[in-house]
């Protein structure tokens, strides 16, 4: 009987347990929802480093048009009017031997401005042409003598010593040294006749030069 009771108790327990399991509700299953998709981010362009600003370089210097400016004043002088009286006095000077060779140096500009010394020299040579007392050293001879000193034919010898030195080279007995000095608007013309052998000034004269 005891075994029967034991079997009965076990069977009852088994029935009870199966009933409890039948009454238990299954656990709710949560539906897994997929996460919302994030919109794709557009690719960012690469960052270009900023270039420092280069300061603007100054442009070329533009000079104003000089064509509209007036040309410098050209002075014209009455060289012949100033030289003729002086040449006449020189030809009458004492101690001058007729037929001698005379070297006429270029007129030296010693004024405070610019003047056409070549024009003055040409006028002086013309005033001495056919003078009847001197034979002039030719322009060609004088040019060759100046070139030997490294000077151009238009250059004045500048000093009396150079003029005397060249006069000896060309066989002249006299040198006529002339210069224009003072104010360029009213220069003074000075002439000196020198003896080549001694360098002595045997005559000198001075006159005013007027503008034309």
From Swiss-Prot:
Highest taxon above the source species: Bacteria
GO cellular component: periplasmic side of cell outer membrane
Membrane-crossing segments per the record: none
Topological category with respect to the lipid bilayer: Lipid-anchor
Lipidation (S-diacylglycerol cysteine): 20
Family matches, as Pfam families: LpoB (PF13036)
Biased composition annotated in UniProt, kind: Pro residues: 36-49
GO biological process terms, semicolon-separated: peptidoglycan biosynthetic process; regulation of cell shape
The entry's keywords: Cell outer membrane, Cell shape, Lipoprotein, Membrane, Palmitate, Peptidoglycan synthesis, Signal
Lipidation (N-palmitoyl cysteine): 20
Localization terms from the record: Cell outer membrane
Entries under Gene3D superfamilies matching the protein: ABC-type transport auxiliary lipoprotein component
Keyword ATP-binding tagged: no
Chief place where the protein resides: membrane
Region Disordered, residue ranges: 28-73
InterPro entries linked: LpoB
Assigned protein family: Belongs to the LpoB family.
Assembly and binders: Interacts with PBP1b.
Family annotation (NCBIfam families): lp (TIGR02722)
Protein name: Penicillin-binding protein activator LpoB
Organism the protein comes from: Salmonella typhimurium (strain LT2 / SGSC1412 / ATCC 700720)
